[in-house]
């Protein structure tokens, strides 16, 4: 029986940890676990068999790191270790006496994807695609993508799985206790994207014990209509007599996992620290528990990598300004590939209150496919707002949907057969919330009845592609009243009927209503209020228009969406009514965007927003009037502090943090060149060594820490990954370094971290050690003798500043 037929109908049991069991069998630090598929197949097979005997329905082949980005061994190819890994798992299940399944286990590449790192999305896709092809070729029953902390990387993996096999796809992500991914994603944004990509089951693994996963499981159940997978660690890692162990024993693990099943999980197993004993007890205690019914959810959600916007009864704003129509300067920016101009438009709208940004780059004389990809990627590096892909070019639409990190809005499909045939397959494949325009082969219906009819046709045709109506928003079209006197009445009637008759969400390009009229914002704002009252979910407007925002804020206050009128009061308390048109509003009417939401474009602002070109130009201008070191202390460092504080509070996400760091790096480079040409010396930089310890090839966290430390003025000596203790100590002595940062992602390599600390204490006793990594916590850091544990990159910066006396 295909595992899809059992999903959600019965409780399925996965296996537990592999790495610690291999280590117990003799796997040496730094040795690639996948090589044991070939060199010690009997030991790998025995571990799989123990899990099957414990009651696992599914075991994961020993292929977690089998991709070209991570697996580097001169003796064996990726194909060879996958073939052997699947064969070992299959042999283990042959004599079990029940139906068993083997999953191709796909872990992360160990690299950050662009723009945060240096791995291209297409290269990540190819790495996963190769593994998938071999997995299906050699008999895997399903693909399990696990321990993912980046939605962009997991999207590459899912597309690789879907496009290169017909196997079921399970996906589990690694969340922290706040319910956040490393790159900032939360539960609703992750669910929106994974469901859009049509995985078979989703959930969480690693990082946390079963008790800590319960709140996140509840969030998953709130948003997903899919079967939920839960694979916790056996609690928290500890050390005793030089051995790593986890603090949740099999009995306690099984007891808590009963709660996990009652709260909605229907595929369960274990991750780090769990053993066949944990799984045996898990099966004994949970096998007879009834499954909680999976409830179908009806939320209309669009998302970015770090933010979900739920289109519900409270109206939302779609910013209209990233569009060349009627905007001379924007057209020039597109032709000249002036990304900073476009990014400032995005930041302006975000600051003014937009929830989603419309993105249209259509010009006759540009390569729209390439430009759309470039603009989408650049926008996602500076804003966490979801995007609406606005194009009539099918190729541009597909490329944007493919490389977009999240679940976008798609603008648009219409009632014409040719449009439906082009757009609906893309929405089915990549996921998205698609805008349905009420126009068909007969044109735009003149009356509300006709537009409602076309809306119904779009919804019904979408269903044939498996697209639920929650992923459709209907645009009944706004016709200008200067040429159609009943245009507003027809639109409002159609709007209301679509909401009432189909129960779908709605969208309108509001400002179309006033073309050809004077003082357009007056008409626009009144029509906007009327549209919201008649069921408008999302208005495509200019959020820099004060008239429109007054209508929006007033409506929300009057309808109770703005609880206690908090937003209205915070915006208007202490202000007075004025008859003058604001500068930003006047600029918008003229087709020229304000510079940056009415904020003076300072170096500090440019760095906070990750505007690299602006940072370069402003720094060059400042050099002529201010001392270089004053610029660093008064502009650069305060800007980095603001971004760092936002990151710690969860209001700034990792991509924005790193883009700000890049902007600061460019400004630093300008200052450094000036100092060098004038014969001045830079201030002496304190040295810090960073290294991922012996046996560990994951250096994402270390690289993030490096970027931030360098921007705060430290001289970072990066020794790379898989670094022996002796090499770290030798460099510390040679360079007389007094602070070393060590990173480890894998439980099995924390022993190397402890050995490194002991050797540093012996050979360089004045050297302090800060540690970080997914498997660590404060207790564990204390046990291995570290001086400081940093749960994120900014904490490492703070410790370094205090250690060197840069702050109190």
Model region roles, listed by residue range:
Residues 1-475, 479-808:
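Domain-level signal for soluble alpha/beta catalytic cores
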């Amino acid at each position: 029986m295909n595992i899809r037929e059992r999903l959600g109908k019965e409780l399925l049991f996965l296996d537990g940890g592999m790495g610690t069991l291999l280590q117990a069998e003799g796997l040496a630090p730094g040795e690639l676990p996948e090589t044991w598929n070939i060199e010690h197949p009997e030991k790998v097979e025995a571990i799989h068999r123990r899990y099957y005997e414990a009651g696992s329905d599914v075991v994961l082949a020993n292929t977690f790191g089998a991709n070209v980005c991570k697996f580097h061994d001169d003796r064996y190819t990726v194909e060879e270790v996958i073939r052997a890994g699947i064969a070992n798992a299959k042999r283990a299940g042959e004599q079990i006496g029940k139906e068993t399944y083997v999953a191709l286990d796909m872990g992360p590449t160990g690299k950050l994807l662009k723009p945060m790192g240096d791995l291209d999305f297409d290269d990540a896709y190819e790495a996963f695609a190769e593994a998938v092809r071999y997995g299906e070729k050699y008999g895997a029953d399903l693909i399990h993508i696990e321990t993912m902390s980046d939605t962009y990387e997991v999207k590459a993996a899912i597309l690789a799985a879907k496009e290169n096999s017909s196997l079921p796809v399970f996906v589990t992500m690694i969340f922290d206790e706040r319910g956040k991914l490393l790159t900032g994603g939360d539960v609703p944004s992750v669910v929106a994207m994974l469901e859009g990509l049509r995985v078979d089951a989703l959930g969480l693994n690693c990082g946390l014990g079963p008790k800590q996963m319960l709140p996140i499981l509840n969030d998953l159940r709130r948003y997903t209509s899919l079967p939920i997978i839960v694979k916790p660690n056996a609690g928290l890692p500890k050390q005793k007599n030089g051995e790593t162990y986890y603090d949740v024993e099999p009995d306690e693990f099984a007891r808590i996992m009963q709660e996990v099943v009652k709260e909605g999980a229907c595929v369960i197993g274990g991750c780090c620290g769990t053993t066949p004993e944990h799984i045996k007890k898990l099966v004994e205690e949970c096998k007879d528990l009834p499954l909680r019914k999976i409830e179908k959810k009806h939320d209309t959600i669009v998302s970015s990598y770090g933010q979900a916007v739920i289109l519900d009864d409270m109206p939302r704003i779609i910013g209209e300004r990233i569009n060349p129509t009627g905007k001379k300067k924007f057209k020039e920016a597109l032709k000249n590939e002036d990304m900073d101009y476009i990014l400032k438009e995005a930041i302006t709208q975000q600051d003014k209150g937009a929830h989603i940004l419309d993105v249209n780059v259509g010009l006759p004389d540009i390569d729209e496919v390439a430009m759309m990809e470039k603009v989408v990627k650049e926008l996602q590096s500076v804003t966490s707002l979801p995007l609406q892909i606005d194009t009539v070019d099918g190729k541009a639409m597909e490329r944007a949907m493919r490389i977009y990190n999240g679940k976008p809005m798609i603008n648009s499909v219409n009632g014409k057969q040719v449009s439906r045939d082009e757009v609906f397959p893309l929405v089915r494949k990549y996921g998205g919330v698609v805008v349905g325009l009420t126009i068909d082969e007969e044109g735009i219906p003149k009356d509300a009845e006709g537009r409602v009819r076309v809306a119904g046709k779009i919804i019904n045709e979408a269903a044939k592609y498996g697209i639920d109506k929650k992923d459709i928003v209907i645009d009944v079209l706004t016709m200008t009243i200067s040429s159609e006197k009943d245009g507003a009445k027809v639109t409002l009637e159609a709007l209301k009927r679509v909401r009432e008759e189909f129960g779908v969400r709605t969208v309108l390009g509001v400002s179309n209503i006033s073309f050809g009229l004077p003082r357009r914002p007056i008409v626009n704002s009144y029509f906007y209020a009327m549209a919201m009252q008649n069921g408008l979910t999302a208005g495509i407007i200019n959020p820099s228009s004060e008239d429109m925002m007054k209508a929006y804020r007033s409506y929300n206050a009057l309808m109770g969406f703005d609880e206690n009128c908090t937003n209205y009061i915070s915006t208007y308390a202490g202000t007075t009514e004025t008859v003058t048109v604001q500068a930003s509003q006047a600029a918008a009417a003229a087709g020229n965007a304000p510079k940056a939401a009415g904020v003076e474009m300072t170096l500090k602002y440019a760095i906070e927003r990750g505007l690299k070109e602006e940072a370069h130009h402003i720094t060059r201008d400042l050099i002529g009037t201010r001392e270089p070191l004053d610029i660093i202390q008064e502009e650069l460092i305060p800007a980095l502090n603001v971004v760092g504080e936002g990151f710690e509070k969860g209001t700034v996400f990792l991509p924005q943090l790193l883009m700000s760091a890049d902007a600061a790096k460019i400004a630093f480079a300008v200052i450094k060149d000036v100092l060098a040409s004038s014969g001045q010396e830079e201030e002496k930089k304190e040295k810090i060594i960073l290294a991922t310890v012996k046996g560990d090839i994951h250096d994402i966290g270390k690289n993030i820490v490096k970027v931030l430390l360098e921007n705060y003025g430290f001289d970072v000596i990066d020794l790379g990954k898989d670094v022996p203790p002796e090499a770290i100590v030798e460099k510390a002595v040679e360079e007389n370094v007094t602070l070393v940062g060590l990173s480890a992602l894998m439980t099995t390599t924390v022993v190397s971290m402890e050995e490194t600390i002991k050797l540093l204490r012996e050979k360089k006793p004045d050297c302090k050690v800060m540690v970080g990594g997914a498997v660590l916590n404060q207790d564990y850091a204390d046990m291995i003798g570290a001086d400081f544990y940093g749960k994120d990159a900014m904490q490492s910066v703070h410790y370094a500043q205090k250690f060197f006396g840069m702050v109190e």
